[in-house]
């Protein structure tokens, strides 16, 4: 089991049509993320798709037949549009368009990641440069506060425990967030809540 403060589940997904008793006779279409995707990196590591070669270098053994998508929403729409497709996304990105597969009988949920019964998870990381401005530090303080972590929890992710109330004050300065297509929707919600 992997433990982290803020965690996402990497839920393998498949389209809903087969779950409702659809046709199971087609060839499975493997849908993967692009090289460099943090979601892909976590998936290949957690599921043993990545191995070391004789030189000790990591090798990604994703099938060459995989259809590559460049972000979470494209992954979801591609899987949803093909009843034979299977792919992977972050649990917090899951919606009614696709469904998550059980792992060892456990449903993909924040509760099951937290209690250890859903064993596939990874941390979300926020990185900054050294010497944050006062405004950027205030936003980070908000993210790590009880208020910010409520946004994290409400969005389906696992919040950091033992947080304190936010005591800063948003200056109204422009907040810019960038990065992974898995993390960006959550960061945008945090930004929106912070700047209210």
Residue map of PLM features:
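Exported/periplasmic ABC-transporter solute-binding proteins
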Residues: 1-196
């Amino acid at each position: 089991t992997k433990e982290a403060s803020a965690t996402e589940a990497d839920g393998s997904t498949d389209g809903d049509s087969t779950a409702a008793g659809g046709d199971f006779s087609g060839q499975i279409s493997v849908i993967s993320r692009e090289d460099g995707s943090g979601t892909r990196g976590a998936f290949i590591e957690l599921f043993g798709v990545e191995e070391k070669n004789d030189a000790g270098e990591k090798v990604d053994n994703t099938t060459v037949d995989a259809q590559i998508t460049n972000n979470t929403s494209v992954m979801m729409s591609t899987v949803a549009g093909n009843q034979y497709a299977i792919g992977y996304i972050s649990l917090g990105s899951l919606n009614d368009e696709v469904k998550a597969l059980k792992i060892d009988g456990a449903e993909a949920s924040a509760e099951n990641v937290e209690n250890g019964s859903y064993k596939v998870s990874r941390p979300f990381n926020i990185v900054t440069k050294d010497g944050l401005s006062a405004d950027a530090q205030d936003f980070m303080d908000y993210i790590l506060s009880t208020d910010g972590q409520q946004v994290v929890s409400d969005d389906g992710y696992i919040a950091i425990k033992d947080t304190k109330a936010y005591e800063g004050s948003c200056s109204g300065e422009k907040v810019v967030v960038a990065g992974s297509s898995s993390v960006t929707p959550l960061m945008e919600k945090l930004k929106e809540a912070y700047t209210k």
